[in-house]
C-alpha cells in the first residue's frame, strides 16, 4: 500500500510541466517577432531558427536568399519585408 500511494503522487508532477511547456513557446516567439520585424510581414525572429513562424513554407525560400544580402549589411531590416535571417537576429 505504501508503494502504490507513492506512485500516485509521482504521476501528477510529470503531468504538470507538460501544459506549461506549450504556452511558453509562443510567448518567447511573440516578443522577438514584434521587435525584430512587423508581424504583418510574416513574423520573423531569432527564436525560430527557420526564419519565420507564419509563412514558414513560402518565406523559407526568400529567407535563404536575403540572408547574406540584407542581414550582412548590418541594417537588419533592409530586406524590405521580403526575407528573414536567422543569423543576424531575424530580419524581414
UniProtKB/Swiss-Prot annotation:
Residue spans of biased composition, Gly residues class: 76-92
Pfam family, one: LCE
RNA-binding listed as a keyword: no
Keywords: Keratinization
Comp. bias (Low complexity): 1-10
Factors inducing expression: By UVB.
Biased composition regions of type Pro residues, renumbered to the chain: 11-22
Tissue note: Skin-specific. Expression was readily detected in adult trunk skin, adult arm skin, fetal skin, penal skin, vulva, esophagus and tongue. Not expressed in the cervix, rectum, lung, colon, or placenta.
Assembly and oligomerization: Interacts with CYSRT1.
Family, similarity comment: Belongs to the LCE family.
General function of this protein: Precursors of the cornified envelope of the stratum corneum.
Name listed for the protein in its UniProt record: Late cornified envelope protein 3E
Organism: Homo sapiens (Human)
Gene for this chain: LCE3E
Amino acid at each position: 500500500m505504501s508503494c502504490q500511494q507513492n506512485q500516485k503522487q509521482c504521476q501528477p508532477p510529470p503531468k504538470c510541466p507538460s501544459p506549461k511547456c506549450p504556452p511558453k513557446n509562443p510567448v518567447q516567439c511573440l516578443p522577438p517577432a514584434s521587435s525584430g520585424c512587423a508581424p504583418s510581414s510574416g513574423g520573423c525572429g531569432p527564436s525560430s531558427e527557420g526564419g519565420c513562424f507564419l509563412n514558414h513554407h513560402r518565406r523559407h525560400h526568400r529567407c535563404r536568399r536575403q540572408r547574406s544580402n540584407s542581414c550582412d549589411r548590418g541594417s537588419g531590416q533592409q530586406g524590405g519585408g521580403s526575407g528573414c535571417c536567422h543569423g543576424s537576429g531575424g530580419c524581414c
